[in-house]
């Protein structure tokens, strides 16, 4: 199966970066808290979980694949497998998140690894 996965091509994505920016607004915090409960005052520290709502890439509908993600081959390598799965994260915060803060999210492809699973078949891990 390794011959069918162009791992050398996929590994050329290593080092590729995606930069997204956003501003933490009071309205975003309000919507976040309405979803998960709680309330955060303006200019107070906000829960770290809100980072999942920040600096999301935008893609027009025509640029989305069947799975709802942007087509593979842009920031993410074009892995020729039918499904994607999030496995884990390593996230760094350089300062406390507060309402009004301009944030930048930098995602970097650190590695692309092929594995063969007895249960699932071929897997490609893209370490971002």
Model-derived regions, located:
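Hydrophobic beta-sheet segments that form the core/acyl-binding groove
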Residues: 84-128
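Hydrophobic, proline/glycine-rich low-complexity stretches
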Residues: 1-102
């Amino acid at each position: 199966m390794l011959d069918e996965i162009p791992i050398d091509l996929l590994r050329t994505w290593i080092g590729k970066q995606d930069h997204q920016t956003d501003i933490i607004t009071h309205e975003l915090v309000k919507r976040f808290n309405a979803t998960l409960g709680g309330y955060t005052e303006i200019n107070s520290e906000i829960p770290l979980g809100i980072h999942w709502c920040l600096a999301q890439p935008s893609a027009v509908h025509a640029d989305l694949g069947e799975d709802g993600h942007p087509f593979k081959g842009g920031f993410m390598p074009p892995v020729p497998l039918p499904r994607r799965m999030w496995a884990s994260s390593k996230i760094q915060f350089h300062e406390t998140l507060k309402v009004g803060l301009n944030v930048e999210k930098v995602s970097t492809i650190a590695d692309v690894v092929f594995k063969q699973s007895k249960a699932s078949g071929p897997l490609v891990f893209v370490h971002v």
